[in-house]
Amino acid sequence: MIKKILKITLAVLVFLGALYGIGRLGVVLYDSYKQVERQPYLQKQTQESVVLKWQTPEKEKGCVRYGKETLSQTRCEETPQKNHRIELDGLQKATTYLYSVDAKSLKIDNDDRYFTTLSDDANMTQRIWVLGDSGNYNESQQEVRTAMKKHLGGKKIDTWLMLGDNAYRSGTQEQYNKGLFNAYPDTLKHNALWAVIGNHDARRWAFYDIFEFPVNGEAGGVASGSEKYYAFDNGNVHFVMLDSQTENRGAEGDMAKWLQRDLAANKKLWTIVVFHHPPYSKGSHDSDSYYDSRGRMVQMRENFLPILEKYDVDLVLSGHSHGYERSLLSHRQYGYSDTFDATKHVVQSDLHDYKKCEEKRPYSGTIYNVAGASSADQNGINPFNVKHPMMPVSYFTDGSLLITVVKNKMEVEFVIRDGEVLDRYSIEKSAAFCR
């Protein structure tokens, strides 16, 4: 009798588990691909093209009107859609175009819409706005956005990066509307958003549905064949975007092999690499713990940092940990924090100003910057009450980064929600520093 009851109980539990699994899959699918209304936004920007995407409540043929001074050209879809995509190609590099989008079932905000194609001008002044873990639609997020707008003082952003966790808590279509599209409407009119996936984004499948990234090297760099990791160039900066959440993080995995090929071919003066999980942190996550984030921080540190430093990457940006942490110009620290030795791992000990040879030299020093602080609504308290020894600069208040690249100098500013610049550092490159 007891055996029979146990069998029946087990069968019921299996049935309920299967039912839950099916229901859960249904929720994930619904949240990931739910049809929502969405204003036009820019994607997959290159020197010669850009993609425009938007979503309407009814099926219709969308059109984009565009031109350098007037809206003299038109590109339309061939079949009615709800999810719209139009690629504008045959454009001129480093050129600003006006554009507007026509839709019948959705009121489009076409005020002040323009974009600028990517440039290969090594002398251009480039301003890069970096947001990390910005997907909470809250007062902090809005204050961080407003503080950067005031700090820019009317200057335009050339490149826009997000470090993952772009829509809390689960990266659904509706959460992306709230945490991204409703939060940054003006920037979305003018700039393609280059983003990496975070752990919260990966709870649903909307990320790779919303975003479209270059896979064939069309924006610069070596073709990756995958939107999970890719590269693009703007001015004299080579950007590399990696998926530390869902992709194989092994040293012999496809992402690592592609990274080596891409960096070996890179001829740009500056290289910035972006991935979500920081190799060094004592913020809201602990990079010493293999149990934290299922070892992703450890794996990125052990398997990817040797590649980045071998090819003389200048700056590595990460989020995930809700704070601001920064290293000095450093190298070769691939172990846990208790193995840190300043005499071995710090290349230059100045707190703010760094010098590098204009030629790429292996292991000449990299700055690691955690900036997952764009919507966390922090109280200024370090949850671990200790700094990571590799990261002597650390603050636990919300803000975002402005990176300004002018020829052979890169300056990074951490602008917090009240407008104060809490940290500023620079790297200068010259033949005079080649010793």
Predicted regions and their residues:
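Phosphate- and divalent-cation-binding pockets in alpha/beta enzyme and binding domains
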Residues: 63, 206, 325-326
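Solvent-exposed loop/turn segments at secondary-structure junctions
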Residues: 134-137, 166-170, 199-203, 236-237, ...
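Active-site neighborhood of phospho(di)ester-bond hydrolases with catalytic His/Asp-centered motifs
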Residues: 130-132, 159-165, 192-199, 242-243, ...
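Conserved, compact domain cores that house catalytic/ligand-binding motifs in diverse enzymes
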Residues: 125-196, 201
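Acidic, histidine-bearing metal-coordination/catalytic regions of metal-dependent phosphoesterases
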Residues: 2-135, 146-155, 271, 361, ...
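Extracytoplasmic/periplasmic, Sec-exported soluble proteins
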Residues: 123, 136, 140, 152-155, ...
